[in-house]
Swiss-Prot record:
Role noted for this protein: The RuvA-RuvB-RuvC complex processes Holliday junction (HJ) DNA during genetic recombination and DNA repair. Endonuclease that resolves HJ intermediates. Cleaves cruciform DNA by making single-stranded nicks across the HJ at symmetrical positions within the homologous arms, yielding a 5'-phosphate and a 3'-hydroxyl group; requires a central core of homology in the junction. The consensus cleavage sequence is 5'-(A/T)TT(C/G)-3'. Cleavage occurs on the 3'-side of the TT dinucleotide at the point of strand exchange.
Gene Ontology biological process terms in this record: DNA recombination; DNA repair
MF annotations from Gene Ontology: crossover junction DNA endonuclease activity; DNA binding; magnesium ion binding
Gene name of the record: ruvC
Any single GO CC term annotated in Swiss-Prot or TrEMBL for this entry: Holliday junction resolvase complex
Protein's organism: Cupriavidus taiwanensis (strain DSM 17343 / BCRC 17206 / CCUG 44338 / CIP 107171 / LMG 19424 / R1) (Ralstonia taiwanensis (strain LMG 19424))
Protein name stated in the entry: Crossover junction endodeoxyribonuclease RuvC
Pfam families documented for this protein: RuvC
Length: 181
């Protein structure tokens, strides 16, 4: 399965393409799509849309994974990030890709094993997991991290959380990290 990971941003959007075969992950490509900071917002969103569409055509992924928007201290920044993310999702869906969404916490836990990992730690682990000769830039590393997150079960924690009410009704509980009943 070929997975395209996206780290959305209005100035710089990272992308990363990996291939999953069994338990092995293989690096295919990564990079960034940059918009002109002097252009108006619609032009910048079109640049992002066109770039995502081109990456999708070039690498022919089977699915895409994208980082969810976090609520920033500055509401204007959050709105702009949401618009960039929307343009990216439109580019992916326009290519016919199923799109999966993950939080930064899910990405960090999947890649580093620690939800408060910093960008440098994510870059280092992405480099090691994909056996890259050098570290990708932070935006590309985050995009590769989202792809790795999806490849390694994606929203397993969310699925388990959805099962929790049924398990509690059946008398099951978690003790020392194990499900007991």
């Amino acid at each position: 399965m070929r997975i395209l990971g996206i780290d959305p941003g209005l100035r710089t959007t990272g992308f990363g393409v990996i291939e999953k075969q069994g338990n092995k992950l293989a690096y295919i490509a990564s990079g960034t799509i940059k918009s002109d900071g002097n252009a108006n917002l619609p032009e910048r969103l079109k640049t992002l849309y066109d770039g995502i569409s081109e990456v999708s055509r070039t690498y022919a992924p089977d699915c895409a994974a994208i980082e969810k928007v976090f609520v920033n201290v500055n509401p204007q920044s959050t709105l702009l990030l949401g618009q960039a993310r929307g343009a990216a999702i439109c580019g992916l869906v326009g290519y016919g890709l199923p799109v999966f969404e993950y939080t930064a916490l899910q990405l960090k836990v999947a890649v580093v094993g620690y939800g408060r990992a910093n960008k440098a730690q994510v870059q280092e682990m992405v480099t090691r997991l994909l056996m890259l000769p050098g570290q990708p830039g932070s935006d590309a590393a985050d995009a590769l991290g989202v792809a790795i997150c999806h490849a390694n079960g994606g929203d397993t924690l969310g699925t388990l959380a959805g099962l929790a009410p049924d398990l509690v009704r059946k008398g099951m509980r978690v003790r020392r990290g194990r499900l007991v009943g």
